[in-house]
Amino acid sequence: MLVQLEHVRKKYGSFTLELNMQIPEDRIIGLIGANGAGKSTTFKLMLGLIRSDQGTVEVLGRNAADLGAEEKLEIGAVFSDSGFSEYLKVQQLIPVMSRFYPDFQEKEFRERCERFQIPLNKQIKEFSTGMKAKLNVLLALSHGSRLLLLDEPDGGAGCGRKRRDP
């Protein structure tokens, strides 16, 4: 199993997340729900950023809280904030990613940036919300991850946005 959550419980104030979930290799699973439903909390549990109050969270065959640097290299993650300085140009992210990820695929990253019209020589702060979201996904895809965790990859627009008729 790529990911396994068994009898997991996490409580924040009056909110309690309870879940059981298994994600086998080579599967695409979507977590859909309203704001505050626990999607981001689930991803943070999988990344070992927070601990469950109860139950077990295993990722890549290990307890998520015990994942080492080598295992974390096999995970690509997108959150609403990339964590990179918005004053950087995309071009400047390439050596950073190459240092963090030995399997960073620079050629493919550059090709994808061109295909999705992400300019390499423009500061991230000049990007629209949609362009920032695309960049974050391209970065997560750029290092051969076994597991991709995409939390609001649309930049926070959410699945519940209202449809506007012309």
Where are the model-predicted features located?
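ABC nucleotide-binding domain signature
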Residues: 30, 73-80
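The feature captures the beta-strand-to-loop junction immediately N-terminal to the Walker
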Residues: 32-34
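Conserved ABC transporter NBD signature motif
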Residues: 55-66, 70-71
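ABC-family P-loop ATPase nucleotide-binding domains
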Residues: 79-136
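Conserved signature/switch motifs of ABC ATPase nucleotide-binding domains
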Residues: 133, 142-145
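Catalytic Walker B motif of ABC-type/P-loop ATPase nucleotide-binding domains
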Residues: 148-152, 157
